[in-house]
C-alpha cells in the first residue's frame, strides 16, 4: 500500500454511506451495460458491484479526499463496449486493490443531449465530455481538485495499469509543484515509431 494514497477502508466506508444517502432503493449490478439505467454508478469493491447512487440533481462531485477514476459511457457507443472488456476485468482484478481510489461510471445514451438522468447529463456538460469513452482522473483534496487528467478513447488493460495505477504518484507529484507528464497513449507511441521510420526512409532516398 502506498503510504500517501489514502485509506481504502475509510473510502469504502464513505462510499457505502454515500450510496445509502443518495438513493432509497439502490440498483446494484455486476457490470454497467447498455440496458442499465442512466445515471451515476460507484464501484463497491467489497461486494464487487456497481451501485447506481444518483439519477437526479446536480453533476457528480467528489465527496471525499482521494483519487477518482470516472468512465463516461454511452450506451450507443461501440468503442465503449470494446472498452468494457478491459475496464471491468481491470477494476475487478487490479483496480479494487488500489488504496484511496474511487471508481465511477457516468452513463447516458448519447452524451448530455440524449440522457434519461439529469445528474449524468449535467456531469457530461460540467466535465466537458465530447468523446466516448472518456476516462477522467481526478485528485480531490479538501474540497478542491488538485490535479486531473482526461484520456479520450478506448484504453487497453496495459494502458489502464499505467494511466490509472500510477495516477496516485503523478497527482502527488503535481501537488508538490513538480512537473508532471501524463503517460503517452499506445497510439501515440505507434505514431512516433511510424514517423521515425518514415524519416529514416526519407533520409535514405
PLM feature spans:
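Thiol-based oxidoreductase modules, predominantly thioredoxin-like and allied folds used
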Residues: 72-74, 97-118
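N-terminal "domain-start" segment that seeds a small globular fold
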Residues: 1-59
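Short active-site neighborhood of thiol/selenol oxidoreductases, capturing the structured segment around
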Residues: 60-76
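Short amphipathic alpha-helical segments
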Residues: 87-92
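Extracellular/periplasmic catalytic domains that process cell-envelope and extracellular macromolecules
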Residues: 62-64, 127-131
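Short, low-complexity, charged amphipathic interaction modules
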Residues: 183-205
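Conserved redox-active cysteine motifs that mediate thiol-disulfide chemistry
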Residues: 72-86
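Non-catalytic, surface beta->alpha helical segment in thiol-disulfide oxidoreductase systems
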Residues: 130-188
Amino acid at each position: 500500500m502506498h503510504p500517501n494514497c489514502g485509506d481504502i477502508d475509510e473510502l469504502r466506508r464513505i462510499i457505502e454511506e454515500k450510496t445509502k444517502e443518495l438513493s432509497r432503493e439502490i440498483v446494484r449490478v455486476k457490470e454497467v451495460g447498455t440496458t442499465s439505467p442512466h445515471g451515476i454508478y460507484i464501484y463497491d469493491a467489497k461486494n464487487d458491484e456497481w451501485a447506481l447512487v444518483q439519477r437526479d440533481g446536480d453533476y457528480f462531485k467528489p465527496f471525499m479526499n482521494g483519487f477518482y477514476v470516472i468512465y463516461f459511457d454511452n450506451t450507443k457507443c461501440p468503442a465503449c463496449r470494446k472498452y468494457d472488456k478491459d475496464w471491468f476485468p481491470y477494476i475487478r482484478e487490479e483496480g479494487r486493490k488500489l488504496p484511496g481510489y474511487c471508481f465511477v461510471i457516468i452513463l447516458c445514451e448519447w452524451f448530455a443531449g440524449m440522457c434519461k438522468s439529469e445528474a449524468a447529463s449535467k456531469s457530461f456538460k460540467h466535465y466537458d465530455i465530447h468523446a466516448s469513452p472518456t476516462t477522467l482522473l481526478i485528485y480531490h483534496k479538501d474540497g478542491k481538485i488538485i490535479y486531473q487528467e482526461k484520456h479520450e478513447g478506448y484504453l487497453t488493460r496495459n494502458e489502464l495499469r499505467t494511466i490509472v495505477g500510477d495516477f496516485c504518484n503523478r497527482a502527488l507529484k503535481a501537488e508538490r509543484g513538480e512537473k508532471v507528464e501524463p503517460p503517452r497513449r499506445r497510439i501515440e507511441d505507434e505514431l512516433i515509431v511510424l514517423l521515425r521510420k518514415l524519416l529514416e526512409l526519407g533520409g535514405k532516398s
